[in-house]
Amino acid sequence: MVLNYIWIAFFVIAFVFAVIGLAMGDTTIFQKIVDSTFDSSKNAFEISLGLTGVLALWLGIMKIGEKAGVVNVLARALSPVFTKLFPDIPKNHPVMGSIFMNIASNMLGLDNAATPTGLKAMAQMQELNQKKDTATNPMIMFLVLNTSGLTIIPTTILAFRASYGAAQPTDVFIPILLATLVATLAGIIITSLWQRINILQHVLLFTIFGMCAFVGIIIWGFGQMDKNTMNTVTTVASNMILLGIILCFILAGFFKKVNVYDAFIEGAKEGFTTAVKIIPYLVAILVGIGVFRASGAMDMVIRGISWSVEQCGFNSDFVGALPTAIMKPLSGSGARGMMLEAMKNYGPDSFVGRLSCIFQGSTDTTFYILAVYFGSVSIRNTRHAVACGLLADLAGVFAAIIIAYLFFG
């Protein structure tokens, strides 16, 4: 229901801004908005088309793991933690393994693996759903974990900084790690409070402290490396782990006497079906965002925030990076464009350039994830998913600003 109102608001606000723009002499404003609808529709289809092959690959690999029993082993291993965080999912259910694969892929920055495993997890949770058009508590918790975007290796951002000539491309690594950790913990706490999950249970507290310790070790380890070594290690480690997962699943299937090839084909067929399912949802959300942006409403919001901050007497250095923060929940490619624009205009080593990179890495594309994940299982009533996801994003934004001032202010 919340998504419904937000989608309507995109068009209403865009029309109001277009009328104001026309009154002020901009005769091309309506054409820009209409053009954006066609561009966004085409972009949505191209995204779905691009996902088809990746979905086929990873759903095929997941099917091998499922038949080989690997997913069940992961589910049993993670059951003590996930049964506390997802109390409505039966103990040792295979979805636990899919959730782990998705979270692990996100942490390693392996987007190509994260989306298919995430969609697989949604399909498995939908099998447990009594109301097929309504999101369940486990679905919402899972979505919030995705939208908070916990990433240990932000490879793409580091590569962009290097290409723009940053003196030290990896200097945003630790700030991104800290900001995304805050966003993830905030998402878990907010959703747990909403769903009345007791986060003070020993298992959950131990897991949270363990996550913090793990991140601390990663920060310390990378802190001992120069930028070239760090870039090499992150690239090699990410791809080696990805290939290792594929090989482990295939070998597990072989030793369990599974017909690995047939299992892969069976799973891959689901990839095409899933890709087709999400097209309408992607078109809807990307067109809504497109008209909102083309109308100039986004620019007005940013200017309004800048003016408000300055009137309050606060340091407004961060405002130049806000377009990336505001765009990130709406569009990943849009936020990436804002980040690159900030580095181009202000410089990659400027405060704004660095903060825009931290914004880009601290959270994920909330509305895109909601559209794709819920769309894949035809969920229409998203309940508190949008609110929890955006609150986690907001926590990540505030954390990013504070951390940027601590490191680079």
Language-model features, listed with the residues they occupy:
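Alpha-helix termini
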Residues: 24, 85-89, 127-132, 164
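Membrane-embedded alpha-helical segments and adjacent helix-loop junctions characteristic
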Residues: 30-127, 256-345
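Hydrophobic alpha-helical context, especially transmembrane and signal-peptide helices
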Residues: 5, 32, 44, 60, ...
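Generic signal for short, ordered secondary-structure residues
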Residues: 100, 104, 139, 230-233, ...
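Residue-level detector of functional hotspots within protein domains
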Residues: 1, 50, 89, 94-96, ...
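C-terminal transmembrane helix pair
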Residues: 113-114, 121-160, 166-196, 322-409
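Signature of multi-pass transmembrane helix bundles
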Residues: 1-53, 159-292, 311-312, 384-409
